[in-house]
């Protein structure tokens, strides 16, 4: 049976080899919450082992974002930092692979004016339009990893102490991502082949509509 450390390493390896498909000489951008430092370091190591030229980091913190939205004026919130947008846009234009490590953000918007929250999202999407366009059109490779938090784990496993709840949530994530397989990377390659075969089969049938 794999240890937690071994599973975490396989999780990081999947992100690099399958999710982002990092190539030799490619730059990599990792966006992650500060609580995920251990995972970020492992992903970074795997990226360099895969031949990454450089790895850049974009750190986030829900509590700091909460404070910003709570205290900043709408005028300030409507002004996205130009340097930050330029940095992200420059990286994707250079073909950087993007690896996002995300949490659920439970409670982040508690007590925040909905108008401010909506304005913040609108401002970000407008400023990062080119960056997101590169990703959504698959002009760069990108992937998303999930990182469990205590708040999320306690929501799912309310009867357990925080440490056990987080451990159980990790196991759910490892199972969903095939990390619990003997060879997770090969398991995903096999899964991709299965999907491709099914797509080919359905396309050859030339179905016009489905009734169910």
Language-model features, listed with the residues they occupy:
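Active-site bordering "gate/hinge" segments
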Residues: 1-212
């Amino acid at each position: 049976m794999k240890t937690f450390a071994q599973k975490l390493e396989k999780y990081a390896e999947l992100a690099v080899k399958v999710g982002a498909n990092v190539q030799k000489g490619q730059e990599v951008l990792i966006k992650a919450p500060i609580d995920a430092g251990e995972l970020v370091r492992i992903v970074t190591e795997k990226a360099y082992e895969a031949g990454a030229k450089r790895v850049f980091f974009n750190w986030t913190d829900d509590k700091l974002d909460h404070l910003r939205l709570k205290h900043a004026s709408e005028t300030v919130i409507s002004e996205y930092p130009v340097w930050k947008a330029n940095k992200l846009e420059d990286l994707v234009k250079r073909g950087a692979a993007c690896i996002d490590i995300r949490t659920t953000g439970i409670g982040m918007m508690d007590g925040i004016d909905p108008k401010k929250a909506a304005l913040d999202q609108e401002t970000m999407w407008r400023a990062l339009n080119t960056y997101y366009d590169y990703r959504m059109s698959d002009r760069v490779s990108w992937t998303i990893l999930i990182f469990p938090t205590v708040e999320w784990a306690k929501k799912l496993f309310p009867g357990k102490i925080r440490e056990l709840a987080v451990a159980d949530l990790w196991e759910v994530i490892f199972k969903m991502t095939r990390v619990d397989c003997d060879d997770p990377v090969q398991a995903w390659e096999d899964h991709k082949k299965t999907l491709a075969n099914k797509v080919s089969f359905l396309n050859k049938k030339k179905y016009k509509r489905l009734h169910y």
